[in-house]
Amino acid sequence: MSGEPIRVSRQLLSKARACVSDIASLSQKIPFFPVERVMDLGPVAFARVSASSRIGWAAIFLKAYALVARRHPVLRSWYVSGFMSHVATCSASVATLAVNRMENGEDRLWFARLEQPDQKSLLEIQAFVTQCTTRPTEELFKRQLQLEMLPRMLRRFILRWNMNSFSEKRATRIGTFSLSTLAGFNATNRLHPTICTTSLSYAPLDSDKRCIVTLLADHRILDGVVSARVLQELEEILCRDVVGELQCLSPEGDNTSTIRESP
């Protein structure tokens, strides 16, 4: 059967995809391993739908994991390579949130930073997440846009330099942990690329309100047992601290002062 001949077209990789490609390549050099836990998040789901303000799951996990990291410095640490390898530790958490947005007909991946999520209310964190999906990208992601415009060799050099820096700017430029999820699309991405020491991902809740939560961990910094304990503590904080804050946002709760204090 004759038909149209097979043809191949080609085009240059966009600057945005080239930047993501560089981050993915650097991520492959880190010895990550996944640890998973099936969490019973029924209490969180009930408190969430009962709240008078909509709080997304991304905001909930950002707050809860930052509360865990407050107690465990290893979750605020990173590996610094060199002749004598070191471990650097930041005094506070900086979250990196992976955000997908459609720009000029193209899916774009952006990386938003949020300093000290553990010190912020769920309302404040949700406002941040909402801004990441609505505000103009040229306002929110100036540094990433500047990085994309650089030649590839220089861009990779800057990324490697930041990864191996002792400066506090390392945390604000890369983050101490990251969060990436496709739960909103009824999918999972347990092995997503990251250059942070740990990264969270969560699956959609099943009919019993159970959720598979994945923690990617840099084996140079922490081991499997520690990671498993972190996930156990994360579930406890979700069902205790986060539920308590969500209940304060319910119509039956006294959330007047909470709303007044939020920007």
Model-inferred region functions:
Residues 1-263:
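C-terminal catalytic/motor cores of large multi-domain enzyme assemblies
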